[in-house]
Amino acid sequence: MEASGKLICRQRQVLFSFLLLGLSLAGAAEPRSYSVVEETEGSSFVTNLAKDLGLEQREFSRRGVRVVSRGNKLHLQLNQETADLLLNEKLDREDLCGHTEPCVLRFQVLLESPFEFFQAELQVIDINDHSPVFLDKQMLVKVSESSPPGTTFPLKNAEDLDVGQNNIENYIISPNSYFRVLTRKRSDGRKYPELVLDKALDREEEAELRLTLTALDGGSPPRSGTAQVYIEVLDVNDNAPEFEQPFYRVQISEDSPVGFLVVKVSATDVDTGVNGEISYSLFQASEEIGKTFKINPLTGEIELKKQLDFEKLQSYEVNIEARDAGTFSGKCTVLIQVIDVNDHAPEVTMSAFTSPIPENAPETVVALFSVSDLDSGENGKISCSIQEDLPFLLKSAENFYTLLTERPLDRESRAEYNITITVTDLGTPMLITQLNMTVLIADVNDNAPAFTQTSYTLFVRENNSPALHIRSVSATDRDSGTNAQVTYSLLPPQDPHLPLTSLVSINADNGHLFALRSLDYEALQGFQFRVGASDHGSPALSSEALVRVVVLDANDNSPFVLYPLQNGSAPCTELVPRAAEPGYLVTKVVAVDGDSGQNAWLSYQLLKATELGLFGVWAHNGEVRTARLLSERDAAKHRLVVLVKDNGEPPRSATATLHVLLVDGFSQPYLPLPEAAPTQAQADLLTVYLVVALASVSSLFLFSVLLFVAVRLCRRSRAASVGRCLVPEGPLPGHLVDMSGTRTLSQSYQYEVCLAGGSGTNEFKFLKPIIPNFPPQCPGKEIQGNSTFPNNFGFNIQ
């Protein structure tokens, strides 16, 4: 983090310096000049930049001094430890500058923190390492014997790659009686020899001469080169060819093709015959001119031999000689000026590039580069740009550009940028250079983990195995690297009584949730808790989600018959009058199931009966009713076995055994009472017995029911304090009745004993239930506030 901060600080200093670069350049001093002799070995000392810049060595190292030169060739190297500026390689002045004098290599010195910019130049001093060389080692000069003394004959000059005093200084010729040599200077500064006739020739005495021409340079010691001059003495030819004009000036575009006609020169000779025939040739042509141009010896047409390059040479001075068949010749000069065309694309030199860059740091310097164009004029003017839809901008100072961020970036929206730097010149047609770079964005922890859901509902079937993987929660972080590594944890529950750490656990790495122990629906129907997700950033960011766990009931409880009691005591006998109509309610089997949902949906069916077809059981409520009219032939005692079955998978069941006694003279509740019969002592005694028996049975039944209800309520109260109750949604099937563990008797019945006074006939009257069914309570927040479930059993006996 500390290194990153220093980098950002340094980049901002560079940016600030570039903003002031224009002002600093306006007041900049003259370029600093240094010199070095050519052919000096590489790594040779040039200067100490720290002393030149007035900097201490520590300050020099801190400011990150760099040496930048135009183009991609760097002839100098900087020792950062000693601040010595050294030669990068051995320099050859002739290769670098040719005949240009002085030979100056320009470079720039860049300083950071704050940014400063100095122009400097290195002058390469020539040494005399080249001797004069004649391109033609043998020259033929034809001299008419009629030539008077003082006649001059130009000779082909020698070439010396050195410059200044190391170039050709003068020419000398071997001793003879007729000629001497003069050293002449052309307009471009080059020197050439001219042969001067001192004494008239006589062909009859001497037909030819062989002389040695020597070219000397001004070096110390001087170097020399020689050529042989053959002088042929001719008979009289008294007229030399003359050009139409002594000087030609032409312009030619540098992109002219090979074979292009540059110009046509023309000369005439007043002589006739062979002496009037003229041939043209290049005179005193340098090696470069000889490679570039050719002349038709018959027509005088000058054509291109190779492509021109304005950036290398802007003009050529070509001497043309017109020679007749005799000894005379004429000369003219053709100045060929090369016109620049836009044939060089701009060049981009990258000095510094930074990637990745932090996403939250505006005005960060990304790249520092320079641009150049070898063309001239409008062809060398340059414009630089990048794509408009990018959050970056360019700032320029002379030919240097800085690429920096325009505003804070968002790595989560875009993790990298492909930037194309387009450099265009103003020539026609315009030439374009493009530099592509990819800038990566470094992540900053600015995004908290986000769960895929704000809440999760998990369904776990009771009696699960411990350490069961029940589900996974997942959170993602838009950051990257350690900033996107998510750790999961359980947050403290809002309910302090909830033993969360003993119920579930979470894998911190992948968010897998595990049930630590087996759950019991009858003890805990559901619970909720919060999970947290935090990243590894600095500072760390986090988020949370709600997890609801719903315990699904399993069919692990069989139906329990509340009535009639099945405790092995004396069986309860139901009395049914023989006069009962079909559908007469004999009794009702009441049962409950500790499970819930469809596991608590109960159905009833008659499993066994003493006489089939006499009684029936309603499947949805357990009511036992007569199926037909009773007759005297029907047995008085009947034993019924009722099967109570839940709707679980697999289903569980229980049975209830009923004893039914058919009696005479016992009426239904709404049947008209029979007329009073004569009092009989025996009938009265029987009535008393029946009343006592019925009262005893009813009292015992009521006491058993109350005791059972009290025990169930006590157990339910303890269970309700641990968890919540869940009630299944949807209607019950038509053949089932919901008897979940939170229910007891759904109805209460009244039993009324009616005695027919004086008749001696005893009848029981069964009344309809007077307590309505209560809908099941759906525990939620109300049950959490009250730990006692509304399970009550009520009976009224008259």
From Swiss-Prot:
Keywords assigned: Calcium, Cell adhesion, Cell membrane, Glycoprotein, Membrane, Repeat, Signal, Transmembrane, Transmembrane helix
MF annotations from Gene Ontology: calcium ion binding
Highest taxon in the source lineage: Eukaryota
Transmembrane segments: 691-711
Gene3D superfamilies recorded: Cadherins (2.60.40.60)
Record organism: Homo sapiens (Human)
Function: Potential calcium-dependent cell-adhesion protein. May be involved in the establishment and maintenance of specific neuronal connections in the brain.
Ranges in the topological domain labelled Cytoplasmic: 712-798
Glycosites: N418, N436, N567
Coiled-coil ranges from the UniProt annotation: none
Side Extracellular, residues: 29-690
Gene Ontology cellular-component annotations: membrane; photoreceptor connecting cilium; photoreceptor disc membrane; plasma membrane; postsynaptic membrane
Signal peptide, first to last residue: 1-28
Keyword Transmembrane helix carried by entry: yes
Intracellular or extracellular location(s): Cell membrane
The protein's name in its UniProt record: Protocadherin beta-13
Matches recorded under InterPro entries: Cadherin-like_dom (IPR002126), Cadherin-like_sf (IPR015919), Cadherin_C (IPR032455), Cadherin_CS (IPR020894), Cadherin_N (IPR013164), Protocadherin/Cadherin-CA (IPR050174)
PROSITE patterns: CADHERIN_1, CADHERIN_2
Topology within the bilayer: Single-pass type I membrane protein
Cadherin domain segment(s): 36-134, 139-243, 248-348, 353-451, 456-561, 568-671
A GO biological-process term: homophilic cell adhesion via plasma membrane adhesion molecules
